[in-house]
Amino acid sequence: MDDADPEERNYDNMLKMLSDLNKDLEKLLEEMEKISVQATWMAYDMVVMRTNPTLAESMRRLEDAFVNCKEEMEKNWQELLHETKQRL
């Protein structure tokens, strides 16, 4: 019986960790969806501004925004992986 108690706690901890991980992944997915919508609107704006002489500047801003978004998502993903490994 004494052996079952730590195993049960370990199982409960694992379930909580998986639940927390699932919530974190859902939050990241929601953020990625928001970013995708923003990128879609930015792309739409670029098409609308096609004849605008400032197209090159707008493209540079779009690229900068994409790179910043990508870096932030990679950073968040690495932090999440690191936290998950620490819990194990």
UniProtKB/Swiss-Prot annotation:
Its main location: nucleus. Residues 7-75 form a coiled coil. Keywords: Cell cycle, Cell division, Chromosome, Coiled coil, Meiosis, Nucleus. One of its GO terms (biological process) is cell division. One of its GO terms (cellular component) is chromosome. Pfam families: Synaptonemal_3 (PF15191). Major component of the transverse central element of synaptonemal complexes (SCS), formed between homologous chromosomes during meiotic prophase. Required for the assembly of the central element of the synaptonemal complex during meiosis, via remodeling of SYCP1 lattice structures and promoting recruitment of SYCE2-TEX12 and SYCE1-SIX60S1 complexes. Required for chromosome loading of the central element-specific SCS proteins, and for initiating synapsis between homologous chromosomes. Chromosome loading appears to require SYCP1. Required for fertility and normal testis development. Homodimer. Can form higher-order homooligomers. Interacts with SYCP1 (via tetrameric core); the interaction remodels SYCP1 homotetramers to 2:1 heterotrimers with SYCE3. SYCP1/SYCE3 heterotrimers form lattice assemblies as part of the mature synaptonemal complex via both lateral and head-to-head interactions. Interacts with the SYCE1-SIX6OS1 complex; the interaction recruits the SYCE1-SIX6OS1 complex to the central element of the synaptonemal complex. This is Synaptonemal complex central element protein 3. The lineage of its organism: Eukaryota, Metazoa, Chordata, Craniata, Vertebrata. The gene is SYCE3.
